[in-house]
Amino acid sequence: MIKGIQITQAANDNLLNSFWLLDSEKGEARCLCAKGDFVEDQIVAVSELGQIEYRELPVDIAPTVKVEGGQHLNVNVLRRETLEDAVNNPEKYPQLTIRVSGYAVRFNSLTPEQQRDVITRTFTQSL
């Protein structure tokens, strides 16, 4: 749990009236503002503050947004027949460029297996 404090008494005079965030789970303190020995956003072990007295302050912490995973979209504006014809007649489509994993690639430079994979993944019957 994180709580905000203002140090009211301390052996180190530079800690007096300084503001900190205490993380009791990690045993750490983050300096919000202090004079002298500590700088803003410095993280120290709570034990480094020594013997202190403090008053608690209300802290409003916004939840952090975590984004995991996601999706990737490759847009190829082609007909299935065009790609199948390019597999059978590569000389007719020397400049045919498609998107694969975010990169532009010439369709004819792919292996036959990769070409079939592109066709299968691009043209599905349903989502």
UniProtKB/Swiss-Prot annotation:
Pfam families for this protein: Gly_radical
Any one cellular-component term (Gene Ontology): cytosol
Name of the protein in its database record: Autonomous glycyl radical cofactor
Glycine radical modification, residue list: G102
Family annotation (Gene3D superfamilies): 3.20.70.20
UniProt keywords, alphabetically: Organic radical
Function: Acts as a radical domain for damaged PFL and possibly other radical proteins.
Glycine radical domain segment(s): 5-127
Biological source species: Pasteurella multocida (strain Pm70)
